[in-house]
A protein has these predicted regions:
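ER/Golgi luminal nucleotide-sugar-dependent glycosyltransferases, focusing on the catalytic module
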Residues: 1-186
Length: 186
């Protein structure tokens, strides 16, 4: 659920694009300067939607807020039942398949939730973002980002994983409407 207490209105800007950092924070504190460069280079605001973990302390949360100026920053406790709305009751057998299955499930939940977060932040700022970038907080960007893109294309990072076998869900981006369409069919 969207929470007003996670909105950081003091960080609202006129930026045209938005970066979603979704997933566990892990090593983000070592990547803050790179994320900041990305935000500046792409004229992007930032939404962070992460999970609680045993590794991240309050100092790291404050450092992220100070260095990256997110417009929305939420930290959720993972709740398997919150994913039932997306997957349905018949898919509860995922609990039997261990961490990988739960990780995928939580990732799809965050993808779906991100649409709602973007819409709420857009509403609060009375604007619509042009390009939406999605990544994990613990990843470094290697791609040269092209901001002059087609309305009908989604671009996937090609430096992570075996590009011949699969497409990375770790970093991708596209214009707002195609991004929303893509996430809705996941």
């Amino acid at each position: 659920k969207f929470s007003e207490q996670n909105v950081l209105k003091e960080n609202f800007t006129k930026n045209r694009n938005i970066l979603l950092l979704i997933g566990h924070l892990r090593t983000i504190k070592y990547l803050l300067k790179y994320h900041k460069k990305f935000l500046v280079k792409t004229n992007s605001d930032l939404i962070i939607s992460t999970w609680t973990d045993d590794e991240t302390d309050d100092k790291t949360f404050e450092l992220i807020k100070e260095k990256l100026n997110p417009v929305y920053f939420e930290i959720e406790e993972f709740n398997f039942n919150s994913t039932v709305d997306i997957f349905g009751n018949l898919n509860k057998f995922d609990l039997m398949f261990g961490k990988a299955s739960l990780s995928t499930r939580s990732q799809i939940y965050k993808f779906s939730k991100s649409l709602h977060l973007i819409e709420k932040i857009e509403y609060l700022q009375n604007k619509k973002y042009e390009i939406i970038f999605k990544s994990r907080p613990d990843l470094l960007f290697f791609s040269n980002i092209n901001l002059h893109i087609s309305d009908k294309s989604i671009f996937f990072e090609n430096t992570i994983g075996d590009w011949n076998r699969d497409r990375s869900d770790r970093f991708f981006y596209g214009k707002r409407d195609i991004y929303f369409s893509f996430i809705k069919i996941l």
